[in-house]
Amino acid sequence: MKAGIHPNYKKVMVKCACGNEFESGSVKDEVRVEICSACHPFYTGRQKFASAAGRVDKFNKKYGLK
């Protein structure tokens, strides 16, 4: 690798919208995410299938399908 052309990789705190914070590595000073493993439905086991069914019903209603 060439010296002096790569950004400095450092440890930073990643902050989620749910309030969870964890340490990771990045070239940025601060990292903010909307969803993390602490609040993602796949990892928490609280998956919501009703929202998908609601979208299907809305589509069927819009296009007159039964």
Curated annotation (Swiss-Prot):
Q: How is the cofactor bound?
A: Binds 1 zinc ion per subunit.
> What gene codes for this chain?
rpmE
| Record-listed Zn(2+) binding positions | 16, 18, 36, 39
Family matches, as InterPro entries: Ribosomal_bL28/bL31-like_sf, Ribosomal_bL31, Ribosomal_bL31_A, Ribosomal_bL31_sf
Query: Can you say what this protein is called?
Result: Large ribosomal subunit protein bL31
What's an example of a GO molecular-function annotation for this chain? rRNA binding
- Domain of life according to the entry: Bacteria
Q: Which GO terms describe its cellular component?
A: ribonucleoprotein complex; ribosome
GO process terms (BP):
translation
Q: Which prosthetic group or cofactor does it need? A: Zn(2+)
Under Pfam families, the record lists: Ribosomal_L31 (PF01197)
Q: Provide the family line.
A: Belongs to the bacterial ribosomal protein bL31 family. Type A subfamily.
